[in-house]
Curated annotation (Swiss-Prot):
PANTHER family: SODIUM-DEPENDENT PHOSPHATE TRANSPORT PROTEIN 2C (PTHR10010:SF35), SOLUTE CARRIER FAMILY 34 SODIUM PHOSPHATE , MEMBER 2-RELATED (PTHR10010). One of its GO terms (molecular function) is sodium:phosphate symporter activity. Expressed only in the kidney. The lineage of its organism: Eukaryota, Metazoa, Chordata, Craniata, Vertebrata. Optimum pH is 7.5. Involved in actively transporting phosphate into cells via Na(+) cotransport in the renal brush border membrane. The cotransport has a Na(+):Pi stoichiometry of 2:1 and is electroneutral. It is a multi-pass membrane protein. This is Sodium-dependent phosphate transport protein 2C. GO terms for cellular component: apical plasma membrane; brush border; brush border membrane. The chain crosses the membrane at residues 76-96, 111-131, 188-208, 325-345, 370-390, 442-462, 488-508, 513-533. The modification Phosphoserine is found at residue 4. It holds the Pfam family Na_Pi_cotrans. It catalyses: 2 Na(+)(out) + phosphate(out) = 2 Na(+)(in) + phosphate(in).
Amino acid sequence: MPNSLAGGQVPNPTLDAFDLVDRSLRNAGISGSIPGLEEGGTDPWTFSPLKNADQLKEVGMASRLRRVVSSFLKACGLLGSLYFFICSLDILSSAFQLLGSKMAGDIFKDNVVLSNPVAGLVIGVLVTVLVQSSSTSSSIVVSMVASKLLTVQVSVPIIMGVNVGTSITSTLVSMAQSGDRDEFQRAFSGSAVHGIFNWLTVLVLLPLESATAALERLSELALGAASLQPGQQAPDILKALTRPFTHLIIQLDSSVITSGITSNTTNSSLIKHWCGFRGETPQGSSEGCGLFSSCTERNSSASPEEDRLLCHHLFAGSKLTDLAVGFILLAGSLLVLCVCLVLIVKLLNSVLKGRIAQAVKTVINADFPFPFGWLSGYLAILVGAGLTFLLQSSSVFTAAIVPLMGVGVIDLERAYPLFLGSNIGTTTTALLAALASPADMLIFAVQVALIHFFFNLAGILLWYLVPVLRLPIPLAKRFGNLTAQYRWVAIVYLLLTFLLLPLAAFGLSLAGGTVLAAVGGPLVGLVLLIILVNVLQQHRPSWLPRCLQSWAWLPLWLHSLEPWDRLVTACCPCRACSNSPMTSKVAHCYENPQVIASQQL
């Protein structure tokens, strides 16, 4: 029943009614539709008004005490979940190193393939995906350059691939929020914006570097202007907190990977079984060790076995192979990772509500007053770089941002500069770590770190300095809208971006540059043409011939995901792959704007 005022007057429509009318008009196609709106009736990119916290008023000392205790326990649970989440990422990285380190070493040994820039880029991506550590991938490159197995020019595309491969971690983390459509839409768009930025930067800088060697020359100029002195290792705050727990599970000797490439030894185990000798201080600590140097005794030590000290971790002295231990750690770390993510999201939704959530969102997403609003994004870049430098891990930082985006604490426009700052922060950490490397590797380590730094800096100049060129943001929103409507698109994106397309490019590069250009050139041109036509169809359809103003003349499966969605739903009838019936039913409530307005009067 509509409410009425005295004298039979009808109250004016509320802002909520106008908002619903506006959304219904958009869903009807008057001003462009958004998949998220079509399905759920709410715009996931515009966070809904928060409930007033006045409803939480308590009476009595017992109720207040109960609320204080509950808040304290939630805070402890949140910190504990975050701690084990970070530890699970560390163990996940160790698992991938155990599973893929030998394969990564075999890939890097083929110097003929590495001389191809496209092949070098793909190898950098695949190796970083395999070992889940940009530091390990960079250390391999530095060792090969120092051993004269690679030139600096050949290593540049590999470093670009390493930068791209690091974004897979945040994408995997976003998959844990696929249960809620809106949360998954925001979280996946946040992970996608990082990968899109890296790929767009590669598409511009890889041809430029192949033609001019700009990054290599710039790093040489920087080295010539600097007087290098061996320095101390970068601060290791995060590892100091997580190492006591993770070292009880597994300890690895990462130098086995690089030594296997440079000295052709492939029979050493990556698992560290011995941590020193009797009567000496165990060398399990990393103090005084550089990023590219080994501070542990090798398993193949010639000392008598009775004089060695067995390491204290779960797999010390185990007869299991590296592959078996890797699979065990992979399953366990993924399980803990998913459980911790679910707990973090639930606790954040419970803690961040009412005025608290409003204050947090306002502070994080706020801009400086006019005319200094443009400085807010650059401050976010500095914050992202500083936090990544302190954490010593860009993967951990980006993986922590993604759940916050899912629950609506950080919006995409603010997360984008944070991710860019994280890219800069991880290169400064590598630069300081390179200064602590041995003297014979110092120059090469610093030059590789500088190339990595200039690559990310050039990406910021390309895709952030000019607001109209911040293309990763709208592209990520489109991916988020697609994944909200068809959740299986996220899996397709993951497989195509980090596995299938790199493998296809790698296979073509093996056939030679002529075959790569003959096959890859037309395909890339076709993709760019389709993108251009789609943009013109939306903004300037009159510029196109009548036949290209719409794709309706093509078969449905070539211009719509509906047939593919029916196929995927038939093969995988689970909730994560299809839309719920309730969601589709709610969408029909916004088809008639007049009905909505009358219901609000």
